[in-house]
Amino acid sequence: MLLNSFGSKICGFSLYETSKPNLYRILKLNKKINFIKGDIRDLNSIQTAVNKFKPDIIFHLAAQSLVKDSYIDPHFTISTNAGGSNNILECCRLSKSLKSIVYITSDKCYENVEWIWGYRENDKLGGYDAYSSSKAASENIFSAYLESFLKQKKIGAASARAGNVIGGGDWSKDRIIPDIIRSISSKKKLVIRNPSSTRPWQHVLDPLMGYIILGMKTFRNNDYSGAWNFGPSNDKVFTVKDVVNQISKNLKINKNKFLLKNNKTANFKEARLLKLNCDKANEYLNWKPKLTSTESINLTSDWYKSYFYKKDMFTETQNQIKKYLKKYE
């Protein structure tokens, strides 16, 4: 919808309805954009889509995005995040129309030693789980294609690294805010694991705007190719417990509905501290997050509140985007 608000002609390529409810269906985006159902692990189907649509810019966001699921099915995670991303880059290499690609990975591509400083784009990549290592691998694949092929073809190519984004319309499993919303709907208690963990909470509109700026820059100037971080403001570091309390307050839910529990028996490792240094984007793209952590949580709460009241969610979402874009005027 953000691209649509700029008047872009859009074609989406994705697996179909990976969650229920589904934002694509809620907003009836099938009436607004072209859509091709497909799996990025299938090179031929992506190649066919690219050849048919002939894009000027590709935004690659497809992924298996859950750390927990990477322990359940590491092969699918790696084949999607590394192998599928390789397929996207191969299509870029072969494309005759493409001018730019923005290749979104994750802040978890960094080898996380849980220090207090934000990670910079030139810090060491790596991971201790299939998800994180798949993202580090996809970054290495990106670097290989950039240096070996895309520069020679004068295709602007940038990798973008963001963290835990929040926002209305997310129904993914094992994510704190969607889990809270499902708990409210089902009237069941929810166990909140690791409430003292910190995450770089930011509203999805902030990094998305960064990606669009990056797409415009690389479209016009290949010098913007390379890696870029898009993290939240450092106004306040929120713990999982902080987020639960704020959402409960906004939606007028008794916070005793949620059971806070340090999960010492989990069979997978998830890092507790991770921050990004975004000085590069601040300096060279003039990009800074427009929303504080509190504003991000409130905006997200407002979206779900409107959904519960059965409002026109296309209009509600559009209004949130319009209000956000005014911050760039």
Task: Label every PLM stretch briefly.
Residues S8, S293-E329:
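Amphipathic terminal alpha-helices
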Residues M1-A162, I166, A271, N319-Y324:
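N-terminal Rossmann-like NAD(P)+-binding domain of SDR-like oxidoreductases, especially those catalyzing
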Residues I180, K217-N267, N277-K280, Y284, ...:
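Mid/C-terminal beta-alpha module of Rossmann-like enzyme folds, strongest
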Residues R93, L146, S185, G215-F219, ...:
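Protein kinase-like catalytic domain
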Residues P178-L190, W201-W228, K249:
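Alpha-helical substrate-binding/gating segment
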Residues L29-K31, N122, F149-G156, I180-I192, ...:
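A short C-terminal helix-loop "cap" of Rossmann-like NAD(P)-dependent dehydrogenase/epimerase domains
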Residues I72, A162-G169, V191-Q202, D223-F238, ...:
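Glycine-rich Rossmann NAD(P)(H)-binding loop
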Residues R41, I72, T80-G83, D129, ...:
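Residue-level signal for the nucleotide or nucleotide-sugar donor/cofactor binding architecture
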